[in-house]
Amino acid sequence: MNEGQEMEEQFALLLETLKNQQMNEFRELFLALHIYEQGQFYQSLDEKDRQHLYNYLSPKELADMFDVIEEDNENMKDYLAEMRPSYAADMLAEMYTDNAVDLLNMLDKSQKAKYLSLLSSEEAGEIKELLHYEDETAGAIMTTEFVSIVANQTVRSAMYVLKNQADMAETIYYVYVVDQENHLVGVISLRDLIVNDDDTLIADILNERVISVHVGDDQEDVAQTIRDYDFLAVPVTDYDDHLLGIVTVDDIIDVIDDEAASDYSGLAGVDVEEVSENPLKAASKRLPWLITLLFLGMSTASLISNYESLVSEASILAVFISLITGTAGNAGTQSLAVAVRRLAMKDEKDSNFGRLILSEVLTGLVTGAVTGLTIMIVVGVWQHNLPLGFVIGMAMLCAITVANLAGSLIPMLMDKLGFDPAVASGPFITTLSDLTSVLIYFNIASMFMRYFV
């Protein structure tokens, strides 16, 4: 029996105990599951069965499971709405603060206020503090549940603090050292606390070179910092270096997934959230790009009409228009994907503007030369007209090179201007390459027409 089949059998047994209202048996089986598996089972239930589950689990037990359910799950609002308000509020209080904030941010203001009013002033205050931070910043994804100590403590004292606060902390692998005014002054790992003598002062073993992020930093920059330094967590500070919270690696994984999805959908000029929207709302988001590109496409049609006399003299030229524009568009899209990826990674060795442009132009020349030579031979043999093959091949070489240049240049210019390079340049490349390819093709054809007509 494979793992999937075993899980299906477990879920079937769980569902049976739930429907038969066997609370003790259900709790024993359910709480023995990994919290990820608990979340999968929970999301497979209908509302009636979930109501039974709420009666069998404490808010704390449900909170542990909600902490691992994908925060972009479109059903999260519905899950919260079907609970008793007091039960939902108790669950929010038991969740890690950053996860509770993510969940509340899915609600409208009145719903958010309702749940906050049911929390204690201390719990509501912690959540409100994070709600104030701008979306997609370090402040918005950080948690305030961490362990901090002061430099004049001993290892014994620090371990006592750690043991008492470990249950509420999201991670204990890093312990942050602050002064009396809560300025971040150092960091110490759990390993250092374990291997040093109990009477050793924290000041003697702490690492004063702390890598931190600012509360207003973009979440992509925070993800880059954690990736570069292989951290499990990174501290978040304000302008005066006061320690405000930490961002953990599990939150960064979510950020990376979200940004990848955003970049992928952006290449097509659509919104990553469209999957959960109705057709009219999705259409309203796509139409601005489509209308803009429609007018740009009309420029291509107008350009072709200007060469009507050329096409009438050599009608064979019309056969290869879509071949050249399509191949150039594909090349431009490839170049765009590479450029967007390099911009997203912010790799220093690839960040040189001129080097990136030169690399893509050379790549375009090589791929264009090979593609152009191939099509020249094919057309020459097929049409028994080598000069025509030369024209098609030369146009292919130039069109691919220009498309590669545009595919790398446009996203970098968009990035310099402060626009999202994926969303702003994705749909633009194919249409632009059509325009430039037609211009290149007909100009080369007009120069050599007397040789192949």
UniProtKB/Swiss-Prot annotation:
Its main location: membrane. Mg(2+) 4 binds at residues 136, 259. The chain crosses the membrane at residues 287-307, 309-329, 361-381, 390-410, 428-448. It comes from the Bacteria. Residues 142-205, 206-262 form the CBS domain. It is a multi-pass membrane protein. Mg(2+) 5 binds at residues 176, 233. Mg(2+) 6 binds at residues 227, 230. Pfam families: CBS, MgtE, MgtE_N. Residues 1-286, 330-360, 411-427 are cytoplasmic. Keywords: CBS domain, Cell membrane, Magnesium, Membrane, Metal-binding, Repeat, Transmembrane, Transmembrane helix, Transport. GO terms for molecular function: magnesium ion transmembrane transporter activity; metal ion binding. Mg(2+) 3 binds at residues 102, 140. The keyword Magnesium applies. The keyword DNA-binding does not apply. It is found in: Cell membrane. Mg(2+) 2 binds at residues 98, 251. It catalyses: Mg(2+)(in) = Mg(2+)(out). Mg(2+) 1 binds at residue 71. Acts as a magnesium transporter. Belongs to the SLC41A transporter family. Homodimer. This is Magnesium transporter MgtE. It comes from Enterococcus faecalis (strain ATCC 700802 / V583). The lineage of its organism: Bacteria, Bacillati, Bacillota, Bacilli, Lactobacillales. The gene is mgtE.
